[in-house]
Every structure is written in structure tokens, then in C-alpha cells.
Design a protein with these regions (language model features):
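Helicase P-loop NTPase motor core
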Residues: 27-35, 275-277, 282-375
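Conserved helicase core region in the C-terminal RecA-like lobe
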Residues: 81-89, 219-222, 248, 359-361, ...
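P-loop NTPase Walker
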Residues: 1-100, 209, 293-296, 579-582
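ATP-hydrolysis module of ASCE/P-loop NTPase motor domains
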Residues: 77, 97-188, 215, 278, ...
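Short, polar/flexible loop-turn hinges at active-site or ligand-entry regions and domain interfaces
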Residues: 46-49, 70-78, 94-108, 120-136, ...
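Accessory C-terminal helicase-associated subdomains
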Residues: 432-536, 557, 565
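ATPase/helicase motor core of nucleic-acid motors
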Residues: 272, 312, 347-479
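Conserved helicase NTPase motor core
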Residues: 2-24, 79, 107-113, 166-268, ...
Length: 582
């Protein structure tokens, strides 16, 4: 493998050893390359571990892959994780220091809505009022309440501060009642991972000190996306004495304010708490001159240095309707495929092209045109979680959840609904009550899974053998049977991905890893035009990009327009545009 060549400034940063470091790295400046090179250097010189934190599982995998390409042994000295993955590991490793008996199950947003609605209907002061709302008003109420609950957790408001900070007594009571309901199910949500890990660390100095001594160096990528809870977890790990922390980020790429993220935690809090040495990376190795010239109009930043030797193309087009826009974009895609462009080796394929929008609904007209033209395309996904389509796979997954968490009556009820039974108090009773032979076998096999999942392969094999031997009349079509087969094969791949990443297997940990998107199987490059929102595509790149739906109210978003040009919301829209362009 050829040695990566760094610029003199990149090399200087990659060679730094002790002390706090802040790297302000503009788009396309090679920050991941610098980060990996520094981690590689640190891992080779420490007997302990380097902690590398990033914000997506894909970024984690990219760092692991780059390190393994140099030397697989380096991975023994590096722990790469997202903040949520790190916090899940901290909680699971020290569950005895929490209020939980066993590692709780991570509930998704749909689960949270069901629990919150149950909480509201069981609260006398809210129940009658809630029942008087129409369906739309109920949905809006649930979303607002869940947002407020998340805000409390992301703001790291502990119980002794609740009454001081949250003046609305009804909201306080709803928050506490919701938590009690979740506790009764031995469940947590994604925000709980951060809050509970933070509480565990600050209330147990010995545990915090254990991590402080374990991780000699800490590196955080995409630090402009930090929210308060994540920053406080970082502070709880490092304490006041651990200063070997490196943050890498770009204020101009901060686009997650709706999740409580803010570049102030990188630019202000980190600077005040750690007094880092600050470096700037402004050279762009990704985008052509025309692209950067356009980006500079958006963010008014004249520090970006162009390094690529070609000009590139950046054009604006205006259309009267979304249909006309979609027709012209697809026509443009057709005319580009098979041609050669400056700075790109070979002829353009559909896979070299991406169509981006502020919101997914904007891409609907593009999808219609691609379909009618019989052109290949796919939607970019985040990779978080795993949703099954077939009844059999859904039943197996729900049964696996209940098998790992017998307190979970929510998913027990969902399982009963799917397999057509009722009034069961346990997984065993569900198995006994199912009349459909194949579903009965599926749920029974899930109920027999070992705590460590050691029989997962054999269990899935048994289900697939039953599927092959089953009467075709049990399925509506051959396609339905094939869909079931594919989903169980996919589940097997997810288990394989999980098993490769850990030394001690756990069925509960596997299910949580799936919820966190940590088991997503690296797929082969998908042929076709990529359709994506800007948020989902962040950190990725394409040779040709069409940015659509740039009308006022859509991009920029109407809520940002209401807030005004100087608002945080409007700055986020500008950052979104900058990310999309670069």
C-alpha cells in the first residue's frame, strides 16, 4: 500500500502528541485523513488505548478500515465509536452502578410515542383533555411532548434541577411519569444513553477514572455537531486533568441544531475548558474552483484555498413548476451519462450522480421521472436500525426482543397483534396460542435463543429449513416466500457483523447494536442515481450533484424565514447549502 502524502500543515497536526488540540477544518480539507494519521501515530506509541469518537457508524467503519489497511494490530489500541455507542458500552459495562438490573432495551421513536400516549391516558389531569383531541391534534401533542422530553435530556437537566429549570409543572410530571413507564419496561431511548452515561460517570468517580486511565488520547471528529449532553459526557470522561483531547470540525458545516447541536461547544466551551492549540485547515482537495467560488458566496469565507487543477461547473436554473424541474434534471442526467468530464477518469455512470434536496418529499417528482424513464436510482439511507417487511421476520424480531427483555409488555402486545393472538402474559403463552404453523415455528425458535446468542446461526437455519419445507399455499406468492427468506438471510448477516465486532456475545447487546445501526452490513455500491436529503448525504460525495427544490419556503425552510435572516435557523439553512455544494 502506498504511503499517504500529507501537506506540511497536515503532517504537523498528525505528528502532535500531548496537549489539547482544536483543528478547524474546512470542507474537503482532508480532515479525516489527518485524524486517521494521528490516531495511527498515537496507537503505535501508547500501551493503552486511543478513543476515537465520531457521529455516524459509517464514519466509524471508515476509520477502522483505514487503520486496518495500515496495520490490523492498530485496532487493538483504538476504540472507535459514536457517542451513543460509547455511552451504551459504558452503561452495559457498569450496569450495577445504574438503576437497572440488566442492560435496558433501546426503544425507537415509534415505541416512545406509544409509551408517551399510554402515560398521558393514565394521567388523570391529562387523560380527558387528550381524549377530546382529534387525530391530528393528538399527533402534534405527542411530537411536542417528545421534543420537550428530549430537550430536557439533551440539556442535561438532572432531577434536582427540574423544578428550577422546567417551570411547567404538568410537563415536569409528564417527563417523570414517562421515565417511570420506560423503567417498568426496562427500556431507555437514545437520549437516555447520553444522560445515563453522564450520570454514571459523575456519580462514580472510580469508574470515570477507569476510562480516564484507559484512554490516553481522545479524538473527536465532526465536533461542530456536538450537543450539550455529548460535550458533558466528554468532560465527565476527561475530568479537569486529562488534556490529551483533539477536536476536529468546521463551524460552517454545523447543520443539526434541531438536535441541540451547536458549534459553540467546539469553538467556545472546549476552548475555555481545555485551552487547546488551534490549527486551521483551509486547503480544499475535493471541489473544483467553480464549486468553491459558489460556496464562498454562501458563507462569505475567503480563506478556502483551491488545490485542484480544473475549473469545474456550477450552474443555476429556474423552473416554473416542480414537474418541469424534475423533467429537466432527469433529461440532464441522461445527457451526462456516458460522457467524459474534466478531472474524472472514465465515462460518467448513473452511480456518479446524486440529486439532493432539503427534504425527502421534494424528491418525489424526481423519482417519478426516473421511474417513467426506466433509469436506475436508490435512496440514500442512514443505516440506523433495521425494519422488516414480512410478518415472519417482524414476529421473529419482536419475539427476540421479548426474549431478551421479559419486562417488555409493549413489544409482547405488538407480537400478539402480528401473529393474531391475545391475552398472553408471556412469550411461551404466545407460542402455545399461535395457530399458523410457520409463524408458530418462527416465534418458538426465537424463544429458544440463548442469552449469548450462540445458537443464532442454527436458529435462523432451522427457520429457513422450515420455510423451504413449508407448503407454498401458506404464502400469498412465491415473491412473499422469497422476501421472508431474504430478510432472515439479512438478519444472519447482521449477527455476523455484530459477532465480528465483539469478544463476548449477548443477545440483548446484539438487539441494541441493531437499534444503534452498528450492525449494518457494508453493501456493494448500488448502481443508480442517488436520491438523498442534504443531512443524510453529509460526508459523502458525488461527481455530479443536482440540488433541487431551491425555492423560498422549502430551501431555505419556511420556519427559518419566519425567524429572520439573523436567526440561528437561517444560519443553519446557509450551512445546509454550503454542505450540499461542497
Amino acid at each position: 500500500m502506498c504511503k499517504i502524502k500529507l501537506s506540511s500543515k497536515q503532517q504537523e497536526i498528525a505528528s502532535l502528541k500531548d496537549g489539547a488540540i482544536l483543528v478547524r477544518a474546512s470542507a474537503g480539507s482532508g480532515k479525516t485523513r489527518v485524524l486517521v494519521e494521528r490516531i495511527k501515530m498515537l496507537a503505535g506509541m501508547t500501551k493503552r488505548k486511543v478513543l476515537a469518537i465520531t457521529f455516524t457508524n459509517k464514519a466509524c467503519e471508515e476509520i477502522r478500515t483505514r487503520l486496518a489497511e495500515v496495520d490490523e494490530n492498530l485496532l487493538e489500541h483504538v476504540f472507535v465509536a459514536t457517542f451513543h455507542g460509547l455511552c451504551e458500552s459504558i452503561i452495559e459495562s457498569h450496569i450495577a452502578a445504574t438503576r437497572f438490573v440488566t442492560m435496558p432495551q433501546i426503544f425507537a421513536d415509534d415505541d416512545r410515542k406509544k409509551i408517551l400516549e399510554e402515560t398521558i391516558t393514565e394521567t388523570p389531569s391529562l387523560s380527558q383533555w387528550y381524549r377530546g383531541l382529534n387525530d391530528k391534534e393528538r399527533r402534534e401533542t405527542l411530537y411536542r411532548a417528545l421534543d420537550n422530553i428530549s430537550l430536557i435530556k439533551r440539556s442535561v437537566i438532572l432531577d434536582d434541577e427540574l423544578s428550577k429549570v422546567i417551570k411547567d409543572g404538568q410537563m415536569r410530571n409528564l417527563y417523570l411519569s414517562y421515565r417511570e413507564q420506560m423503567d417498568s419496561l426496562n427500556a431507555i431511548d437514545f437520549d437516555d444513553l447520553l444522560l445515563n452515561a453522564y450520570q454514571l460517570l459523575i456519580h462514580n468517580p472510580r469508574i470515570a477514572d477507569l476510562y480516564r486511565r484507559s484512554f490516553t488520547y481522545i479524538c473527536v471528529d465532526e465536533a461542530q455537531d456536538l450537543n450539550k449532553a455529548q460535550y458533558m459526557v466528554l468532560r465527565a470522561i476527561t475530568g479537569s486533568e486529562h488534556k490529551n483531547v483533539m477536536l476536529v470540525g468546521d463551524t460552517k458545516q454545523s447543520i443539526y441544531a434541531f438536535n441541540g447541536s451547536s458549534s459553540k461547544y467546539m469553538d467556545d466551551w472546549f476552548v475555555n475548558d481545555y485551552t487547546p492549540t488551534i490549527y486551521n485547515l483551509n486547503e480544499n482537495y475535493r471541489s473544483a474552483k467553480a464549486i468553491l467560488d459558489y460556496a464562498q458566496k454562501v458563507v462569505h469565507d475567503d480563506t478556502l484555498d483551491v488545490t485542484l487543477p480544473y475549473t469545474g461547473v456550477c450552474k443555476e436554473y429556474a423552473y416554473d413548476t416542480p414537474c418541469e424541474e424534475a423533467q429537466e434534471v432527469v433529461s440532464g442526467i441522461k445527457s451526462l451519462v456516458g460522457t467524459e468530464i474534466e478531472g474524472y477518469d472514465g465515462k460518467l455512470s448513473y452511480s456518479d450522480i446524486a440529486v439532493l434536496a432539503r427534504n425527502k418529499f421534494v424528491l418525489g417528482k424526481i423519482e417519478e421521472q426516473l421511474k417513467s424513464s426506466n433509469l436506475p436510482y436508490h435512496y440514500k439511507t442512514t443505516g440506523a436500525g433495521l425494519e422488516f417487511a414480512s410478518t415472519a421476520a417482524k414476529a421473529f424480531d419482536l419475539a427476540m426482543v421479548v426474549r431478551t427483555n421479559p419486562y417488555d409488555r409493549l413489544h409482547l402486545d405488538m407480537l400478539q397483534s402480528i401473529v393474531g393472538v391475545s391475552h398472553c402474559k408471556s412469550l411461551e403463552q404466545v407460542v402455545e396460542s399461535i395457530s399458523d404453523a410457520f409463524l408458530k415455528e418462527v416465534v418458538q425458535q426465537a424463544s429458544l435463543l440463548e442469552d449469548d446468542g450462540s445458537n443464532m446461526y442454527q436458529t435462523i437455519k432451522s427457520v429457513l429449513n422450515t420455510l423451504k419445507a413449508s407448503n407454498a399455499s401458506e404464502f400469498k406468492s412465491t415473491d412473499e416466500a422469497l422476501a421472508v427468506f431474504d430478510e432472515f438471510e439479512l438478519l444472519k448477516h447482521h449477527w455476523s457483523s455484530y459477532a465480528k465486532s465483539v469478544t463476548n456475545y449477548s443477545l440483548s447487546a446484539f438487539r441494541n447494536a441493531m437499534s444503534l445501526g452498528q450492525t449494518s452490513v457494508a453493501s456493494l455500491d448500488v448502481e443508480g442515481v442517488t436520491l438523498s436529503t442534504v443531512h443524510t448525504m453529509k460526508g459523502q460525495q458525488a461527481v455530479v450533484v443536482f440540488l433541487v427544490g431551491m425555492d423560498e419556503g422549502t430551501f431555505p425552510d419556511y420556519r427559518a424565514i419566519k425567524k429572520g435572516n439573523n436567526s440561528i435557523e437561517m444560519q443553519q439553512e446557509k450551512n445546509n447549502l454550503y454542505v450540499a455544494i461542497t
